[in-house]
C-alpha cells in the first residue's frame, strides 16, 4: 500500500511478483482509556465535530495500519482528528495510558493483555467482528457505513513462476490454513485465516490501492520510506 501513499518503490506489486494468494487478515481497535466518558464511537465522533482539531490519536507511525485507519475515519466522517505517530505499538500504549492522546488504534492482543481494565475498545476496524473480541462492534455497526480498514498478509512468489507451481503453493497454503490447530493459534494472535485464489488476491490488492490513494489524496504527511 506504500505506493498508494506516494512512496516511490523499486518494484511493482503486480509486475514484479506472482501473486499466490491471500493468507490472513487482521484488525485494529479504536480504544480510549477506561475512565474516558465516551462509551461509543458515535460519542467520539460527536465530540470531534464539536472540538475540531482538538482530539488526537496515537498510531504506530506514518503509513502504519493505525494511521491508515485514522485517516479513513477522518475522511469518511469529516471529523478533524490529529494523528500523533509513535515508534511502534509499545509507545502507542504508553501514550494512551499516559494521557498524551485521547484515542489510539491498538491490537486485540493489547486489549486482552496490558489493556485489560485500562482500555475501552469502541470499534473494530474490520468489516466483521473479531472472533476474539466478539462484543466489540464494527465501525459500520457503530454508524460509519462502509468502513473497512482491515489489513492482510499474503503469499507472493518470484515473477514468472510457472502457473502450476503457483497453483501448488496456493493449494498448500489453503491446506495449512484449514488446519484447526493452526487457525486457533493464529486467532490468539488476532489473525484470521482468509485463504483466496490468486485472482481474488489480485482484486484485494487493487481495491486497497485505490481506497488508500483516495483516502490520502491531497495529504502532505510524509510517509516513512
What are these regions (language model features)?
Residues 4-91, 139, 152-185:
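Hinge/capping helix and adjacent helix->loop/strand transition within the periplasmic-binding protein
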Residues 71-76, 90-101, 112-118, 205-208:
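Short helices/loops that flank or line small-molecule/ion binding pockets
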Residues 8-10, 14, 25, 110-177, ...:
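C-terminal lobe and pocket-closing loops
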Residues 86, 105-106, 124, 196:
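Short beta-strand and adjacent tight-turn residues that come in two discontinuous sequence segments
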Residues 40, 85, 99-100, 113, ...:
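Conserved functional loop/turn residues at catalytic and ligand-binding sites
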Residues 76-77, 163-225:
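An extracytoplasmic/periplasmic, membrane-proximal ligand-sensing/linker region
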Residues 29, 102-103, 121:
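Short, Asp-centered acidic motifs that coordinate Mg2+ and/or phosphate
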Amino acid at each position: 500500500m506504500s505506493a498508494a501513499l506516494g512512496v516511490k518503490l523499486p518494484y511493482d506489486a503486480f509486475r514484479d511478483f506472482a501473486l499466490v494468494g491471500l493468507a490472513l487478515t487482521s484488525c485494529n481497535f479504536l480504544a480510549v482509556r477506561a475512565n474516558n466518558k465516551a462509551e461509543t464511537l458515535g460519542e467520539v465522533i460527536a465530540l470531534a465535530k464539536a472540538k475540531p482539531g482538538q482530539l488526537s490519536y496515537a498510531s504506530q507511525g506514518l503509513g502504519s495500519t493505525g494511521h491508515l485507519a485514522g485517516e479513513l475515519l477522518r475522511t469518511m466522517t469529516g471529523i478533524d482528528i490529529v494523528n500523533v505517530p509513535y515508534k511502534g505499538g509499545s509507545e502507542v500504549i504508553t501514550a494512551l495510558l499516559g494521557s498524551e492522546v485521547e484515542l489510539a488504534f491498538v491490537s486485540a492482543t493489547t486489549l486482552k493483555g496490558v489493556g485489560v481494565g485500562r482500555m475501552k475498545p469502541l470499534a473494530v476496524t474490520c468489516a466483521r467482528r473479531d472472533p476474539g473480541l466478539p462484543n466489540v462492534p464494527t465501525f459500520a455497526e457503530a454508524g460509519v457505513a462502509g468502513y473497512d480498514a482491515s489489513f492482510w498478509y499474503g503469499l507472493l512468489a518470484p515473477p514468472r513462476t510457472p502457473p502450476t507451481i503457483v497453483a501448488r503453493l496456493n493449494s498448500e497454503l489453503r491446506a495449512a490454513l484449514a488446519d484447526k490447530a493452526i487457525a486457533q493459534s493464529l486467532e490468539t494472535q488476532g489473525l484470521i485465516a482468509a485463504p483466496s485464489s490468486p485472482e481474488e488476491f489480485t482484486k484485494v490488492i487493487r481495491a486497497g490501492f485505490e481506497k488508500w490513494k483516495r483516502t490520502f489524496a491531497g495529504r502532505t504527511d510524509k510517509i516513512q520510506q
